[in-house]
């Protein structure tokens, strides 16, 4: 059960890290305009942009997960 959850999280993180969409940051508000709360789409966009910077750590996590799948979760 825990192996399935770890595998699901790893695959989801990999999918987010390798997306090649042209995600642009939201334009800043001009002077005198009211600032509003970021929408859910803005939060998802920021999360996907931050995942791109952690690709090396995601690769190390993948190697660790492969090791765990062979040693701990293998039957």
UniProtKB/Swiss-Prot annotation:
One of its GO terms (cellular component) is membrane. Disulfide bonds: none annotated. The keyword Mitochondrion does not apply. InterPro entries: SMIM7 (IPR037659). Residues 1-17 form the signal peptide. It is a single-pass type I membrane protein. It is found in: Membrane. The chain crosses the membrane at residues 54-74. Residues 75 are cytoplasmic. Keywords: Membrane, Signal, Transmembrane, Transmembrane helix. The keyword Lipid biosynthesis does not apply. Belongs to the SMIM7 family. This is Small integral membrane protein 7. It comes from Homo sapiens.
């Amino acid at each position: 059960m825990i192996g399935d959850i770890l595998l699901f999280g790893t695959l989801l993180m990999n999918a987010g890290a390798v997306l090649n969409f042209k995600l642009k940051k939201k334009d800043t508000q001009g002077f005198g305009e009211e600032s509003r709360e970021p929408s859910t789409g803005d939060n998802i966009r920021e999360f996907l942009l931050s995942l791109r910077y952690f690709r090396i750590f995601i690769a190390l996590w993948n190697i660790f997960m492969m090791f765990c799948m062979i040693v701990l979760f293998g039957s």
